[in-house]
Amino acid sequence: MSSSVSPLAPKTVPDMPVIAGVRLATAEAGIRYKNRTDVLLAVMDKGTAVAGVFTKSKCPSAPVEWCRAKLKGGKARALVVNSGNANAFTGKTGRSSTALTAKIAAKAVGCSESEIFLASTGVIGEPLDATKFDGVLGRLAETAEPGDYLAAAKAIMTTDTFPKVATATVKLGKAKVTINGMAKGAGMIAPDMATMLSFVFTDAPIAPAALQALLKSGVEDTFNAVTIDGDTSTSDTLLAFATGAAAEHGAPKISRASDPRLKAFVKAFNQVLANLAEQVARDGEGARKLVEITVEGAKTKASARKIAMSIANSPLVKTAIAGEDANWGRVVMAVGKAGEPADRDKLSISFNGIRVARSGARDPDYDEAQVSEAMKAPEIAIKVSLGLGKGRDRVMTCDLTKEYVAINGDYRS
């Protein structure tokens, strides 16, 4: 957790409404540091549906493995999140810690261990002492209230400089339903199916299979379209919980993701995911500039995504942006190395709406002073036009600064 807030942080924080069927509490358990809030417990009412997407890393954390196994049941009563220790690459000890944490949480909440979901973030490779949860989770279960999402978001931060929350309210049938979300990120972010840690709660009555389909679809153009440093975490987890409490106020029970009554809900749900994903990009470690990369005219959307990610993950592109240099040559390099169809002589590039390259060469109207001034902006939009087809996609990233090196060089110390 940084002491200075990113200059890209949102100027305002939304008021997070209560969601019926969800109670939250946080505590200091001394997971890695003293005098730091590092545990979150979310308690959900019986019958709450759960869905999740996770890292595709071949070295997943013990909590990720636990959640994947329990997701099959489709129901959740509690979520336990700790910061400071990822419980990843910890072998049998890590799996035992996960099992013990779930056992303690189940006893505290009064449910089956199969209804407990877990997430950990922090240092990889160090054993997690799950006995630190003993007593703590019991107290949290007793004191949990349907309230402070901002405090909950703070509890899961590591190198984040600000808590990330988002909310939306929408009609489902004749009833109002609420969607609240929180996330943490900052570094080791190049998601594949999920990203970092993020948790979304709603009172909509949506069945587990339908919620899973909505989540899997929703992450594709939100969390999966964000990268900070090209490194996919061992712990990436996105969980969604639907308490169904809005059914008491007339919200229809939804069993299929294709139900037309979900149209407005899906839009709001995806907006919450997009909001959280952008906040993650805004809080990239050491970031001073938010970068949006759009690739159009590709053969396919998938091809456009791959090229956009190649640009977004290029250290040379990212450091040029940090230096406020519209170095389109580095963008050309990143396009060429992506391994996707591209024609040098059809390529056009612009920075913040100013075209710098056209048809494979520098734009004849290029004005160095104009472009240099545009690069001073805190938000940079790079557009690449390939001229090959109709494929288009957009990804978010940030610049790469000296602060990123300092943060990660000192991470374990």
From Swiss-Prot:
It comes from the Bacteria. CDD domains: OAT. Heterotetramer of two alpha and two beta chains. It comes from Bradyrhizobium diazoefficiens (strain JCM 10833 / BCRC 13528 / IAM 13628 / NBRC 14792 / USDA 110). Keywords: Acyltransferase, Amino-acid biosynthesis, Arginine biosynthesis, Autocatalytic cleavage, Cytoplasm, Multifunctional enzyme, Transferase. This is Arginine biosynthesis bifunctional protein ArgJ. HAMAP family: ArgJ (MF_01106). It holds the Pfam family ArgJ. The record marks 194-195 as: Cleavage. GO terms for molecular function: glutamate N-acetyltransferase activity; L-glutamate N-acetyltransferase activity. Belongs to the ArgJ family. Its main location: cytoplasm. Substrate binds at residues 158, 184, 195, 285, 408, 413. GO terms for biological process: L-arginine biosynthetic process; ornithine biosynthetic process. Its EC number is 2.3.1.35, 2.3.1.1. The active site is at 195 (nucleophile). Catalyzes two activities which are involved in the cyclic version of arginine biosynthesis: the synthesis of N-acetylglutamate from glutamate and acetyl-CoA as the acetyl donor, and of ornithine by transacetylation between N(2)-acetylornithine and glutamate. It is an enzyme of class 2 (transferase). Pathway: Amino-acid biosynthesis; L-arginine biosynthesis; L-ornithine and N-acetyl-L-glutamate from L-glutamate and N(2)-acetyl-L-ornithine (cyclic): step 1/1; Amino-acid biosynthesis; L-arginine biosynthesis; N(2)-acetyl-L-ornithine from L-glutamate: step 1/4. It is found in: Cytoplasm. The gene is argJ. The keyword Amino-acid biosynthesis applies. It catalyses: N(2)-acetyl-L-ornithine + L-glutamate = N-acetyl-L-glutamate + L-ornithine; L-glutamate + acetyl-CoA = N-acetyl-L-glutamate + CoA + H(+).
